[in-house]
C-alpha cells in the first residue's frame, strides 16, 4: 500500500511566515479559502486563475508577464488591468508587499539573503545597458522554496524516526516537492496515515526546537492511499 502525505499550501505558508503578513496569517489560521476570496476580490474568472496569479506574484510576476502569458489571455491582455490586480493584491497583503521590498533591498545592498534556518543565498547582478540588474524573480523565489524544503526535511526526518524499528516492512520510498510517500503492508495503513498527519502538524514545534524561532503558523497535510500512485484516494 502506498501512503502519500501532501503538505497543504506549503509555499503560501512559507511566504506568509517569512513576510509575517497579518491578513495571510489570519486566513491560514481560520481555514479561509484565500483563492476563492481573491477570485471575487480581484474580479478573476476562476479560483484556479486566482491561485495561479497569486503564486506567480509571490515569485515576482509582473503586469507585463501576465498580459503576455497565453494562459491568461482570456482574462486580459492589458498591462493596465494586471497592474490594477497586482495593486489590489498588495493592498490586501501589505506585509507581503513590505517583505518583497525588503528582500530586494537586502539582496541588492548585501548581495545575499539569509533565512531563519541558516540558508544563505547569494546573488550577483548582470550588467544591462551599463546598469547592474539583480534577478528579482530569483530573489523572491529562493527564500520561499528554500524554507519549504527545510520544512519538508523536518517532516521527513520526524517520520523516519517514528517509523524506525516499529514498522520493519514499511519504507520511505519517495519525496516529490511537497509530498512524502511510504510503501507499507496494508495492515499498517491507518496507523501510518495518522502518523503522516501528525508529523506535519508537529513541524512548527520541531522548527522552534531546531532553530530557536517560533513558526507561528499551523502546518497541515492531506493523506492519500492506494495500491499505485495513479489510484490514490483521500484517507480519512
Q: Would you name each region that the model predicts?
A:
Residues 1-236:
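Conserved catalytic core of nucleotide polymerization and phosphodiester-bond processing enzymes
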